[in-house]
Regions:
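Positively charged n-region of N-terminal signal peptides that target proteins for export
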Residues: 1-4, 499
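Alpha-helical scaffold elements lining the catalytic groove of polysaccharide deacetylases
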Residues: 161, 185-197
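Hydrophobic h-region of N-terminal signal peptides that target proteins for export
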Residues: 8-18
Length: 499
C-alpha cells in the first residue's frame, strides 16, 4: 500500500508542474506576426518545418479556430475573436492543412503550442447566438446568453439592440474585453466546454500545449483548472503587465500550473534598459544579495515559469516595440533563465544567422530555464555568467564592454555590441556555428534527441567508449539513463548529459 501511495503521490506531483518543465532547455519560435497569413499560413510553415527544427523545439501558432471577420483562408483576420471552436478552418489554412503542419513538425521533434482564446467569443449572426460546439466523443455544448458575464457590454450598452440586458451569467472575474462577449468562467458548463475544446485540440489535431490569450480577463485559477483537465506539455499565459508582483500573483493563482510571458523583463531590461543604453535597468537584485537578469527571471521562485521575448505580434506594432539593437536583445534573453521565445520577423530577417548562432551556443552550454545567472557588470555595460548543464556561458552587451577574453574561455560569437564566451574545453568539443547543416544534440527529461540534417552516420557512446547506437537518420530520439554520453558524426563530436 505504501508503495502504491508513493507512486500516486509522485504522479500528482509531476502533474502539478508538468506545464512548466523543470530546468527546460526548450526554445520557442512565435511562428506568426500580425496579418502574416500569406507568409506563415499552415502550408508556408509546413515548407519551413525542417529549418525551424534546426533551432527550435517549440512553436507557438496563431489562433486556429474559425473567427469573426469571415475567416477566409489568406484573409486579414487574426482569429482573436473566435466564432466556432470546433471549426479549425481559418484564415491560416484548412483543418487538414493544420493537421499536416502539426504532423510535419512532430516528425522533426518540434512541439506545437496552440493560441487559446477563451476569455471571450463572437456570436454567429448576432451578439449572443453562439454556434454549437460539437467535439464528437469529447462532448457537445451549446453556449447561450446564460453563459455571458452579467457586466458584459451586452447589458451595459444600448447599442446591443434586442440583445440588450439578456446576459445572465455571473460578474466577470477579470477585466472586460469589449470586442466580443465575455464568457462566465465561474459556470461549470463553460468550464466543461473549454476543457472539451482543449482535449479535442490535443486528441484530434495533436497540439502539445497552450498559450492563453488575454489572461487579465478572468481569474488565473481557471487556467489551473483547464490545465489539470488537459495536462499540456507546456502552458503560458499572456498576463500583460510590466510589474513583477501582478505577474507573480497570476502564476500563483494558477496553482503554479502555468508559465507567463515575462513582460517585466521586456519592459525593464529591454525597452527601458538596453534600448536606452541604461544597463543598470537590465538587472534586479534577488533577495537583497545577488544581481540577476531583470524580470520574472531574476528570482528563483519564478524563472521556471517565465517565457522571455523581445517582441510579439502585438508589441511590435505600437509604442511597446523594442527599438534597440535586436541582436543584443537576443543575446540577453538567450543567456538568461526562462524559456526564450523568438519572434518570427526577427528570425526570418537579417538577424537570422546571429540568432541561430546564439541558440546553438545556449544549447552548447546547456543554459536552461532555471539556470543560475549572475550579473557581474551593470553600469557601463552588461555582463552575465549563466551556469548551464554543460558549462558557464559569459555574455557581454554594450559598446563599452571589454574585448579581452576571460581566462579559460574562448570567444565563440560576437556582433555589434554583444559577445559570447564558452569555456575553452567546451568550445573545443564542437565549433559553435550558425550552419544549417550542423549536428544538433539536445538532452532533456531522460531523452537524447539528435538532429542530423546531412544524414551522415552518427554514433552514440557512453563514457567508457561502448557503442550504444548507430544510425544515419536525420532525426532520432533515444530514451537513456541519466549519464554523460558522446555523440560522433564524422569530425563532429559532442558531449552531452542526459538528466
Amino acid at each position: 500500500m505504501k508503495r502504491v501511495l508513493a507512486f500516486a503521490l509522485s504522479v500528482v506531483s509531476l502533474g502539478v508542474y508538468a506545464q512548466a518543465p523543470a530546468e527546460s532547455e526548450d526554445i520557442m519560435l512565435q511562428g506568426f506576426y500580425w496579418n502574416s497569413q500569406r507568409q506563415t499560413g499552415w502550408t508556408q510553415l509546413t515548407d519551413q518545418a525542417a529549418d525551424i527544427a534546426k533551432s527550435f523545439n517549440l512553436i507557438w501558432l496563431p489562433p486556429s479556430a474559425s473567427a469573426e471577420g469571415g475567416g477566409a483562408v489568406g484573409g486579414n483576420n487574426m482569429g482573436y475573436h473566435p466564432r466556432q471552436w470546433n471549426n479549425q478552418t481559418s484564415c491560416w489554412g484548412t483543418a487538414e492543412q493544420l493537421k499536416t503542419l502539426i504532423s510535419t513538425l512532430h516528425n522533426s521533434n518540434v512541439k506545437v503550442i496552440a493560441d487559446i482564446v477563451v476569455n471571450h467569443r463572437a456570436g454567429d449572426t448576432g451578439w449572443g447566438n453562439f454556434t454549437k460546439d460539437d467535439f464528437g466523443t469529447y462532448g457537445s455544448y451549446q453556449l447561450t446568453t446564460d453563459h455571458i458575464c452579467s457586466n458584459d457590454e451586452m447589458n451595459t450598452t444600448p447599442s446591443a439592440g434586442s440583445w440588450y440586458g439578456t446576459a445572465k451569467g455571473a460578474k466577470d472575474t477579470g477585466e472586460n474585453w469589449d470586442g466580443a462577449r465575455d464568457l462566465d468562467h465561474t459556470s461549470t458548463y463553460v468550464q466543461q466546454d473549454i476543457e472539451a475544446y482543449l482535449n479535442w485540440l490535443h486528441g484530434e489535431y495533436g497540439y502539445d500545449g497552450w498559450r492563453y490569450d488575454f489572461c487579465k480577463g478572468y481569474n488565473g485559477k481557471y487556467v489551473g483548472l483547464f490545465n489539470e483537465a488537459t495536462q499540456p506539455y507546456l502552458s503560458v499565459g499572456e498576463y500583460w503587465d510590466g510589474s513583477y508582483d501582478p505577474v507573480a500573483a497570476w502564476i500563483v493563482a494558477t496553482g503554479k500550473q502555468s508559465m507567463a510571458f515575462d513582460f517585466p523583463a521586456k519592459y525593464a531590461a529591454l525597452n527601458n534598459g538596453l534600448a536606452k543604453n541604461n544597463f543598470s535597468n537590465m538587472s534586479w537584485i534577488e533577495d537583497k544579495t545577488t544581481w540577476r537578469p531583470a524580470g520574472m527571471i531574476h528570482h528563483h521562485n519564478y524563472n521556471r515559469y517565465s517565457v522571455t521575448f523581445v517582441d510579439n505580434h502585438d508589441t511590435y506594432r505600437d509604442s511597446n516595440k523594442y527599438t534597440g539593437n535586436v541582436q543584443a536583445a537576443y543575446a540577453f534573453i538567450l543567456s538568461s533563465p526562462g524559456i526564450p521565445c523568438v519572434f518570427y520577423p526577427h528570425w526570418a530577417g537579417a538577424d537570422r544567422d546571429a540568432i541561430n548562432q546564439m541558440i546553438a551556443i545556449r544549447r552548447q552550454a546547456g543554459v536552461h530555464s532555471e539556470s543560475n545567472v549572475t550579473v557581474t557588470a551593470r553600469s557601463q555595460y552588461y555582463e552575465s555568467h549563466a551556469v548551464g548543464h554543460h558549462g558557464t556561458l559569459i555574455t557581454r552587451i554594450g559598446a563599452a564592454a571589454p574585448t579581452t577574453v576571460p581566462e579559460g574561455y574562448t570567444l565563440v560569437a560576437s556582433g555589434a555590441q554583444w559577445q559570447m564566451f564558452l569555456p575553452t574545453e567546451l568550445a573545443a568539443v564542437h565549433a559553435v556555428t550558425a550552419s544549417d547543416n550542423a549536428l544538433r544534440v539536445n538532452a532533456q527529461n531522460g531523452q537524447l534527441t539528435i538532429n542530423n540534417p546531412q544524414g551522415h552516420t552518427f554514433q552514440v557512446f557512453d563514457t567508457d567508449g561502448r557503442l550504444l547506437h548507430q544510425s544515419s537518420t536525420t532525426c532520432c530520439t533515444l530514451s537513456l539513463p541519466a549519464a554523460p554520453y558522446v555523440v560522433k558524426s564524422g569530425k563532429e563530436v559532442k558531449k552531452v548529459s542526459v538528466r
